């Protein structure tokens, strides 16, 4: 992973519940990786960023009345992120998975455009380690 990625920037967005901006931040870096790495979308770092982006978009969707999209992306994130446990590139994965595992069962019986089942939306903060 590029050490120039400023996880502190991502944590500020994540911890402020600004998941739309988190998705954009991750998407920009994912796009760069798939264009510059020989494995493209199969690159492990790219897959890691994609899994985080799926989680962020799920959290964004559930708060913006798109429960079907939130469930789909939560499932995608849960399929991708466990392989990066416990820590990948300095980011702790378990807190993200815990929020996804709490949210997903609550989405199952909701109407597509229902309110977020968690009022207020409670999520684990992004935890990262400073890499030297």
Task: Name what the model sees in each region.
Residues 14, 19, 25-27, 33, ...:
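Inward-facing hydrophobic residues that define packing positions of alpha-helical scaffold repeats
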Residues 42-48, 86-110:
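TPR/TPR-like alpha-solenoid helical repeat scaffolds
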Residues 51, 61, 70-80:
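Alpha-helical protein-protein interaction scaffolds
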Residues 107-132:
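A hydrophobic membrane-anchoring alpha-helix module
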Residues 32-37, 80-88:
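Alpha-helical junction/boundary sensor with strong preference for TPR arrays
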